[in-house]
């Protein structure tokens, strides 16, 4: 696995975490 693919995978994982956090915050309101 080259570094570009690795960076993309990490980026997607971080974005998914952010979306999940936003959904949680939205539910807690």
Curated annotation (Swiss-Prot):
It is a single-pass membrane protein. Induction: Expressed during exponential growth in rich medium and at lower levels in exponential and stationary phase in minimal medium (zorO mRNA cannot be distinguished from zorP mRNA by these assays as they are practically identical). Translation of this mRNA is repressed by secondary structures in its 5' UTR and partially by OrzO sRNA. Processing of the 5' UTR increases its translation in vitro and comparative toxicity in vivo. Keywords: Cell inner membrane, Cell membrane, Membrane, Toxin-antitoxin system, Transmembrane, Transmembrane helix. Its main location: membrane. One of its GO terms (cellular component) is plasma membrane. The chain crosses the membrane at residues 10-27. It is found in: Cell inner membrane. A short internal peptide (AARL, residues 20-24) is toxic against B.subtilis, S.aureus and the yeast Candida albicans but not against E.coli, green monkey (Vero) or hamster cells (BHK) cultured cells. It functions in various growth media and might be used as an antimicrobial peptide. The intact protein is not toxic under any tested conditions when added to growth medium. Toxic component of a type I toxin-antitoxin (TA) system. Expression in the absence of its cognate antitoxin (small sRNA orzO) leads to cell stasis and a decrease in colony-forming units. Repression of ZorO toxicity requires base pairing between zorO mRNA and sRNA OrzO, as well as RNase III (rnc), suggesting the mRNA is degraded. Base pairing occurs between 18 bases in the 5' UTR of zorO mRNA and the 5' end of OrzO sRNA. sRNA OrzP, which differs only in 4 of these 18 bases, does not repress ZorO toxicity. This is Small toxic protein ZorO. The lineage of its organism: Bacteria, Pseudomonadati, Pseudomonadota, Gammaproteobacteria, Enterobacterales.
């Amino acid at each position: 696995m080259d570094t570009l693919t690795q960076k993309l995978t990490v980026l997607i994982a971080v974005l998914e975490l952010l979306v999940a956090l936003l959904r949680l915050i939205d539910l807690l309101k």
